[in-house]
Amino acid sequence: SLSLEPIVKIKAFASGGVDPAYMGLGPVPAVRKVLKATGMSLGDIQMIELNEAFAAQAIGCMRELGIDNDRPNELGSGISLGHPIGCTGARQMVTGMSHMQRKDYSTGLFTMCIGGGMGMAMIVER
């Protein structure tokens, strides 16, 4: 045993999808599902990480979900931090957990848009 303790706990996660023609909005139904599963609202979430490779995707998701411009991606996102194929989830979690510790945040929402209209969302707690 290494006596390691988790930095965060996964409260819930969900996937969802939209018509592939609107693939950038894939995280929207996933976020709605994960909020419903936890009984939380976006107002209960302290850190929101919308990882998108293109600004139009993030803006579309923010508009659909009613997220103010100043809330998500406090450290940047896929656009500024990099969008390596196959590494997005790991990059988000490491960056996000570290940021949650620095800011003493207790809740975080992570989303990913996946090609073809799919999206994922996860809420974590410290």
Per-region residue spans from a language model:
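Claisen-condensing/thiolase-fold acyl-transfer catalytic domains that form or cleave C-C bonds
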Residues: 1-126
